Amino acid sequence: MNISIPQIIAAILNFIILLLIVKHFWFDKITAVVDSRQSEIINKIEDTDKNQKLALELKEKNELELSNAKKQGKTIVEEYKSKAENVYEDIVKEAHEEADRIIKKSRLEAERQKKNAEEEIRAEAVELAVLVSSKTLEKTIDDLEHRRLIKDFISKVGI
């Protein structure tokens, strides 16, 4: 295959003419389509970047709200725990006070019963003393009999 210079020049001229025809009729349209597609791609990239930034902002906002909610929940739990402890302490304090009142009342009642018992013993002692005196007056007793009566009296009284 032989290639000659006039063929090369003819091919170059044909290519230039074809290029000029394409440029004149279709190059503006092709450039417009390419530019349109390029701007569309750029807009989509920008929208994607905006959406990604918005998503990150929303994520940070949600994480902050979640953190605040956890803190608030912890605060509420601690507050109710503190209130429950205060109620517990109040109940225990009231129980101790009630127990102290019951003990004091029981001691007072025991003291009252003790005094009543002492009064009864004194009354019995007086009665026994009167009885012993009347027996003594009824008969004359010697010193030994007198001591025996006193010992009986003391043993009955419980002194």
Swiss-Prot record:
Membrane topology, as annotated: Single-pass membrane protein
Coiled coil: none
InterPro entries xref list: ATP_synth_B-like_membr_sf, ATP_synth_b/b'su_bac/chlpt, ATP_synth_F0_bsu_bac, ATP_synthase_B_chain
TM annotation in the entry: 2-22
Keyword field: ATP synthesis, Cell membrane, CF(0), Hydrogen ion transport, Ion transport, Membrane, Transmembrane, Transmembrane helix, Transport
A Pfam cross-reference name: ATP-synt_B
An annotated GO cellular component: proton-transporting ATP synthase complex
Molecular function terms, GO-annotated: proton-transporting ATP synthase activity, rotational mechanism; proton-transporting ATPase activity, rotational mechanism
Subcellular location: Cell membrane
Chief subcellular location: membrane
Ion transport as UniProt keyword: yes
Record-stated family: Belongs to the ATPase B chain family.
Oligomer and partners: F-type ATPases have 2 components, F(1) - the catalytic core - and F(0) - the membrane proton channel. F(1) has five subunits: alpha(3), beta(3), gamma(1), delta(1), epsilon(1). F(0) has three main subunits: a(1), b(2) and c(10-14). The alpha and beta chains form an alternating ring which encloses part of the gamma chain. F(1) is attached to F(0) by a central stalk formed by the gamma and epsilon chains, while a peripheral stalk is formed by the delta and b chains.
Biological function: F(1)F(0) ATP synthase produces ATP from ADP in the presence of a proton or sodium gradient. F-type ATPases consist of two structural domains, F(1) containing the extramembraneous catalytic core and F(0) containing the membrane proton channel, linked together by a central stalk and a peripheral stalk. During catalysis, ATP synthesis in the catalytic domain of F(1) is coupled via a rotary mechanism of the central stalk subunits to proton translocation. Component of the F(0) channel, it forms part of the peripheral stalk, linking F(1) to F(0).
Protein name: ATP synthase subunit b
Source organism: Clostridium botulinum (strain ATCC 19397 / Type A)
Taxonomy of the source species: Bacteria, Bacillati, Bacillota, Clostridia, Eubacteriales
